[in-house]
Amino acid sequence: MANGSRIGTLCIIDREPRDFCSEDEELLKDLAAMVEQELTAVQLATLDEMTNLTNRRGFMGVANKILSLCVRNQIPATLAFIDLNNFKSINDQHGHAEGDRALVDFSQQLATAFRSSDVVARLGGDEFVVLFTGTSRQHAENTMIKFSSVLEEANKKPEGKYSLSFSYGLVDYNHHAYPAIEDFLEQADLLMYENKVSRHSMPK
């Protein structure tokens, strides 16, 4: 059991039939404890401590495996690169503790806005990604628009000191154009930046 969930079964196999004794039971308990500790260590190494989202290391590992499967099975994949707007202003005006709370609030909204099959991660700072697979580019675009609307509703809470919003870039995966996951991220980041610049240049 790990966090109350069954994760597998351990068994002892011998060439000769024999009764299950207390020593065998203790051995199994020790082995199970070792496995659980190892799984916990792996999980902690790939989780962002503040937000409990997958961190950059975890995302890179998972994304590489998923994209390889997508190539082999001709499954479409789309990456959204997300950056919070005016995050520096939140830190400057309200302090870093409030900035951390903003990141946590945003992450909680992210974690519930997408399908369980979508990979949501915090790369670091105020940068996040969502990897969509098995769906169309239009679905990814619609999902991001819907998430923006959800965030706008959350901003209407009377106790809010500031509003959270984001800019994003969407890129369809092509393993010829993006042979490495870093290339895929870089292109999505570039489109996000263009989106952010265009938002700032819009008349208010």
Give the predicted meaning of each segment.
Residues 20-37:
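Amphipathic alpha-helical "output/dimerization" segments
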Residues 1-14:
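Sensory-domain boundary capping and coupling elements
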Residues 13, 131-133:
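Short hydrophobic/aromatic beta-strand micro-patches
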Residues 38-45, 60, 198, 202:
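Amphipathic coiled-coil signal-coupling helices
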Residues 56-78, 85-115, 121-125, 129-130, ...:
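Conserved long alpha-helical elements within nucleotide-processing catalytic cores of c-di-GMP signaling
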Residues 10, 162-167:
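PAS and PAS-like sensory/regulatory domains
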